[in-house]
């Protein structure tokens, strides 16, 4: 790894299949974070719903939900501090004032500092026969929260958001170099192809890195990956429970943008829809 000197920074995707045993999920997060750190990673991205997951949402999700600052984020903070790495993971967040629905939230955890950024999923998975919105409340449209690690600026988005290019465009416009994308990309006909195309497109059209961590099978599609600003997969995992590490750098982003200055040449900005359910 000595060839990657200067501002290069090692990041990892961690792929596993979270379940209904919250203690087991945390133990697997700790194991995979340690494995990634041993391979040189300084930031590790875990899947959506890493704190708790069942294939069919129900009242158990409300019971398993936690506030930010609760046991799950406290445990992540302890792991991050012990290993000296940043962690990004999805969790089920308890929302005040809503007795049924929870938040599908991603948190970024820094060593010694705890939560440094958070994101509530904007676009819920009401597609392909699923109705995530029955049990999950959408996040509010707000300025993207970024955090910095190793001189690299990171943003957050979640799973189904990948089908909405405006989400990633707002993140790159806020100044991010990398978008971390925890996911629970459900398997199905052509779904693996959709996952690869969309993840690659978000990296290529924004000339930024995408670090996309999915659930391992049998429910998730696997295929967690890190894609560079030219749309090249520089680290991938197939179906295994594992981690994959790659180097990211602002120099690579700048070099790609000199060749492909699409962001500078565009003629449109992203604005929020006034009536998002009008069509």
Describe the residue ranges of each PLM region.
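N-terminal glycine-/serine-/threonine-rich phosphate-binding loop
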Residues: 1-43
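Beta-strand-turn-beta hairpins that frame and shape the catalytic cleft
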Residues: 2-11, 146-155, 178
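Residue-level recognition of beta-strand->loop/alpha-helix junctions
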Residues: 15-17, 47, 120, 214
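Cys-nucleophile CN-hydrolase/nitrilase-fold catalytic domain and related Cys-dependent amidase chemistry
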Residues: 22, 30-112, 118, 186-205
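CN hydrolase (nitrilase-like) catalytic-core segments centered on the catalytic cysteine
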Residues: 68-88, 162-244
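Short beta-strand scaffold segments in enzyme catalytic cores
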Residues: 89-91, 104-108, 145, 224-226, ...
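Active-site catalytic loop in hydrolytic enzyme cores
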Residues: 97-174, 187-197, 201, 258-262, ...
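A short C-terminal boundary segment appended to hydrolase-like catalytic domains
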Residues: 251-279
């Amino acid at each position: 790894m000595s060839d990657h000197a200067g501002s290069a920074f090692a990041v990892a995707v961690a792929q596993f299949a979270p379940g209904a045993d919250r203690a087991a999920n945390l133990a697997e997060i700790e194991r995979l974070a340690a494995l990634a750190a041993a391979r040189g990673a300084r930031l590790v991205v875990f899947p959506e719903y890493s704190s708790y997951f069942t294939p069919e949402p129900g009242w158990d999700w409300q019971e398993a939900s936690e506030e930010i600052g609760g046991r799950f984020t406290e445990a992540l903070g302890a792991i991050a501090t012990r290993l000296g790495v940043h962690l990004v993971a999805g969790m089920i967040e308890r929302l005040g004032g809503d007795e049924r629905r929870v938040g599908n939230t991603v948190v970024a955890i820094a060593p010694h500092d705890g939560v440094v950024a958070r994101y509530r999923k904007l676009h819920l998975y009401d597609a392909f026969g699923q109705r995530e919105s029955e049990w999950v409340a959408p996040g509010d449209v707000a300025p993207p929260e970024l955090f910095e690690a190793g001189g690299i600026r990171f943003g957050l988005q979640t799973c189904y958001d990948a089908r909405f290019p405006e989400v990633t465009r707002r993140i790159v416009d806020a100044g991010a170099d990398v978008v971390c994308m925890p996911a629970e990309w459900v398997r199905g006909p052509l779904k693996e192809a959709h996952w690869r195309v969309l993840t690659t497109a978000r990296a290529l059209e924004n000339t930024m890195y995408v670090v996309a961590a999915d659930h391992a099978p049998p429910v998730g599609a696997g295929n967690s990956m890190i894609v560079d600003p030219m749309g090249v997969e520089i680290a991938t995992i197939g179906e295994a429970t594992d981690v994959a590490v790659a180097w990211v750098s602002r120099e690579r982003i700048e070099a790609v943008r000199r060749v492909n200055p699409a962001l500078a040449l565009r003629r449109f900005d992203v604005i929020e829809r006034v009536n998002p359910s009008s069509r």
